[in-house]
């Protein structure tokens, strides 16, 4: 249903698909590829209307993507919210020069982390607090609320970043068996009426 709604106003010959999938094995992604190919039909040259962004180029080739239409990124990079990787291509196309400004901001944050000892200590303290609360105080959840409208999707980003990346199986010999917390939250002025009640 969602796919049908999205393509309804589109013209097949003028539509370009960017398939972003780290593994090229997620059911929803593969179904979307098939639906897109079916919708495009004979009116479109597949190579001119589809590219793939993935860490698994051989799997993309199985679905008909040619080498020239596959943008590869390292397997170590997360598949979602990977702003610093080719996964961000749709955002680059949409935002243009604004995305360059965003990258400059990211570079400034990296530079601050590398050069500012107080900032490093702050981040270490914050990280160790999470480990302490989770492993020793048994606080397995954390709420993140943002009160800036521009930051309203930050919780979504943090959920994906932390629960996918930090939630991987820990070293079986580590004293820290719980690597991350369950992250909840949203836009503060609306979400506070639910999370703050508990």
Each language-model region and where it sits:
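Glycine-rich oxoanion-binding loops at beta->alpha junctions
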Residues: 1-14
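Generic beta-sheet signal
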Residues: 15-17, 142
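Local beta-strand N-terminus motif with an aromatic residue
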Residues: 14-15, 162
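Extended, hydrophobic alpha-helical segments in both membrane/secreted and soluble proteins
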Residues: 3, 19-22, 26-40, 50-52, ...
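A generic alpha-helix structural signal
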Residues: 7, 33, 103-106
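Glycine-rich, anion-gripping cofactor-binding loops and their flanking helix/strand elements
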Residues: 8, 23, 193-196
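Active-site phosphate/pyrophosphate-binding segments
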Residues: 39-198
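Short acidic, glycine/Ser/Thr-rich loop/turn "cap" segments at secondary-structure junctions
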Residues: 17-21, 71-72
């Amino acid at each position: 249903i969602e796919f049908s709604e999205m393509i309804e106003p589109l013209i097949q010959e003028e539509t370009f698909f960017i398939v972003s999938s780290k593994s090229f094995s997620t059911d929803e992604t593969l179904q979307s590829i098939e639906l897109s190919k079916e919708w495009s039909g004979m009116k479109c040259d597949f190579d001119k209307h589809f590219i793939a962004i993935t860490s698994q180029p051989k799997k993309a080739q199985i679905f008909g993507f040619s080498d020239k239409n596959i943008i590869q990124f390292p397997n170590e990079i997360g598949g979602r919210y990977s702003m610093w990787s080719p996964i961000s291509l749709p955002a680059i196309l949409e935002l243009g020069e604004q995305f360059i400004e965003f990258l400059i901001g990211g570079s400034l944050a990296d530079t601050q982390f590398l050069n500012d000892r107080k900032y490093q200590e702050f981040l270490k303290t914050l990280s160790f607090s999470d480990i302490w609360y989770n492993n020793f105080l048994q606080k397995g959840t954390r709420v993140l609320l943002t009160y800036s409208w521009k930051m309203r999707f930050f919780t979504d980003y943090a959920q994906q970043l932390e629960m996918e990346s930090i939630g991987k199986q820990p070293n079986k010999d580590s004293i820290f068996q719980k690597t991350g917390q369950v992250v909840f939250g949203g836009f503060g002025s609306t979400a506070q009426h639910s999370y703050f009640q508990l």
